């Protein structure tokens, strides 16, 4: 995190801070306004609303009729036009895109284990087509990464694991052809299990979300930084507290208010020499924009 000044004295470079656009649950225009308030120009964007005809925009509250353009209006086209206008005029850069299957069921830990990511056979062909289009969009937006949850990694199911690895290799190869890197988000696997998978998948990397490890009850995120260090390319800044009941979700909190241990986590990133984007994400709470602004301010203080 250091750069040389004109006097030759080393000075720490400012941290690279971005935001997850989907956290705002708002239109691109409103997201742009919030980003301007906090002086951030790099955003992570969900790709699926623009490539999956059955997806919903983050600001529609799940009202699919708005996505289909009922009444002669096409909000998807308008959102994409606004995004691409912000990219063209230099107001925005896309740090990462997100592919998330619309079949993911986060009701319980068990439901997401069954339905999440690229694992379910019944949705693979559809997901394969959608993720291919999402990769093309990622390249068009000049984003270096596309992020997804692989799904439940079960090392005891050799046939199932081999199938998942084949699917990830397919997606990785599509990414390579497009000049994009595939990053898997930490979630329902331990750091050791994810590292074992990645060791067999050259060219696949990690989006490290420390809160997810806590929400799923999958270990200490600070230790996990060291385990996954060779693969970490992108970071979500998010906090959470562990569940007191095994088998149930933990709870998300404001950044620095949970069990991640912000000081130790940032120190761990510095220790491994991470200098990529720290993307603030908030998926709970009544004032997401305010919470994200406070997280951005906190990160900027940590020079």
Model regions and ranges:
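Active-site acidic/histidine proton-transfer and metal-coordination neighborhood
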Residues: 104-205
